[in-house]
Amino acid sequence: MHEMSIAMSVIDAVTEKARQEGCSKVTGIELVVGHLSGVEVESLKFCFSAACRDTPADGAELVIEECEAVGRCEACGETFPITSFYAKCPSCAQFRVQIESGQELSVRSITIE
């Protein structure tokens, strides 16, 4: 389960940022997680609650925005939603699809005090 290492990395990053800003408490964290990122959102939520215990982020609210995956056909330029890394263009039936979004895993914002 790599979600625990992700949760711990997020906690480390946001608590370090809070420390740099002279704050001692993280009260909220907002993440963006793409559907093709390989992250199980429910597992990440579970791991987050365990990872933040006894840290400045203990009790912080976690908000996760799930980002749809979008591909662009390199043959015809069509942009369309995708559900896997291997997608076929709905317009020209080519498999030359570049993933435009959906692999994200990032901290959008933190709330500190």
UniProtKB/Swiss-Prot annotation:
Residues that bind Ni(2+): H2
GO MF annotation, one: zinc ion binding
InterPro entries membership: Hydgase_Ni_incorp_HypA/HybF_CS, HypA/HybF
Keywords of this entry: Metal-binding, Nickel, Zinc
A single GO BP: protein modification process
Residues that, per the record, bind Zn(2+): C73, C76, C89, C92
NCBIfam families, A to Z: hypA (TIGR00100)
UniProt record similarity statement: Belongs to the HypA/HybF family.
Protein function: Involved in the maturation of [NiFe] hydrogenases. Required for nickel insertion into the metal center of the hydrogenase.
Name this protein carries in UniProt: Hydrogenase maturation factor HypA
Lineage, highest ranks first: Bacteria, Pseudomonadati, Chlorobiota, Chlorobiia, Chlorobiales
